[in-house]
Amino acid sequence: SDVYKRQVAACVAAAAVGPENVLGIAMPSRYSSQHSIDDAKYTAQALGIEFKIESIDGMHSNLESQIGEMLTAGSSVASENIQSRLRGIIVMAHANAQGRMAIATGNKSELAQGYCTLYGDMAGGYTPLGDLYKMQVYALADVFNKRALDFGLKAPISKSTLTKPCLLYTSDAADDP
């Protein structure tokens, strides 16, 4: 899933500015798995960061009622990108309201392929994983886990996160390249 890179980005943020200064937000939709939400919560608890769950379903339903015809015409990309953009709105609202820096979670593999959403997962003032290829992000996850375990702490990224299939949870069958 896409969860692993968000968890690694949270680890980078907590290491850079201290866990007391990091807010993690899970923003599930109708396509999100409970497992992904649980994994995000696990990481937040392991890192000691503030964590909120804010569903995008209400916003998504309202938008579908207003422009649903446009979202269902042709490719499913429009509908899938709307979900990412709604998440970007929530992240930026928190950043603006609380004087925080939003971070984007894209990696070099995604950015090189254009596999990202403008005003969605690209929303943020900094992209800490932007110079790392996807496999390097996985390696960094291992580094954060090993470091935590070496200090007698809980590994911040669960094994289930690192071993589950890469699904985007933006539709019933969307893959992450």
Where are these regions (language model features)?
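Short, glycine/charged-enriched secondary-structure capping and boundary segments
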Residues: 13, 38-40, 67, 116-120
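Solvent-exposed alpha-helical segments within well-ordered globular domains of core cellular machineries
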Residues: 10-11, 15, 38, 92-93
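Single conserved hydrophobic/aromatic residue that forms the stacking wall/gate
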Residues: 4, 169-177
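Mobile late-domain/C-terminal helix-loop "cap" segments
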Residues: 130, 149-171
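A conserved beta-strand->alpha-helix junction
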Residues: 21-75, 84, 110, 156-165
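A phosphate-binding catalytic loop at a beta-strand-loop-alpha-helix junction
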Residues: 1-18
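Structured core elements
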Residues: 8, 23-26, 50-55, 60, ...
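Active-site adenylate/phosphate-handling loop in enzymes that bind or generate adenylated species
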Residues: 17-18, 72-150
